[in-house]
Amino acid sequence: MSNELTDRKFWANYWESKTDLAFQVPATYTFNQLFKKLLAHKPIKTAIELGGFPGYYAIFLKKYFGLHTTLFDFYVHQPVLKDVLAANQLTQQDVKVIEGDLFKYQPQEQYDLVLSCGLIEHFQDTKDIIDRHLQFLNPGGTLFITLPNFTGVNGWVQRTYDMDNYNKHNISSMNPTLLAQYCQQLGLKDVEAYYYGYYSIWLENMKQQSAATKGFLKLLWAAGKVFTKVVPVESKALSPYIVVRAVK
């Protein structure tokens, strides 16, 4: 059985269906506080974003922290990438790009920081895909992984309104305890795995939903935001993300 839950055609269709991809990545981009904390305490100069097309985090780390960044993906739409870089006052010389298969590619160099944001949940064998990250990582380097949490309210939204997208995700991977165990089994140190963010919901196909559905989801989003202002707790039920961090 193939390890991948998606293929090249899926991602080609996915990115070609998107509009407004070329925006200026803000200093407040998702996970910015975590990156600030990490970079304040570690001498990180190089980073590679795996499965990250169109490279928003590689751009973020280059633009705001001056890191030497690389984007690795098995599908890179060059016109989109060029537009995204230009929107951030960068050129194709500023972010190195490697188009390749993570299961076949032999890294030519290693990096101080290896990150992926929304990659590992698209594979059946979670431990194996985490292990694939490590070949890119310098000894003493930091592994930083994020993935969506579809085991709570946001998962219900996905199952109810976009089952096709839900099925492209390995829901069993969305378990911080299990993710920490995998990292420890792979020999990583200082392992942290936890739910992140108080609350959010989204749909990839929101534009295709009815007005009634859009209205309901807007109310559900607002209700969750109000609740988590009163009870600001990160949890399986409400947090939109899971974060994993470890040292090689």
Task: Please annotate each region the language model reported.
Residues K62, G66, Q124, N138:
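Short conserved AdoMet
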Residues I48-G52, V97, L115, N138, ...:
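Generic detector of intrinsically disordered, low-complexity, polar/charged segments
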Residues G118-H122:
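A short His-aromatic
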Residues N3-R8, N13-Y29, N88, L102-F103, ...:
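S-adenosyl-L-methionine-dependent methyltransferase catalytic module, highlighting the catalytic core
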Residues M1-E109, L113, C117, I130, ...:
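Conserved N-terminal segment of class I S-adenosyl-L-methionine
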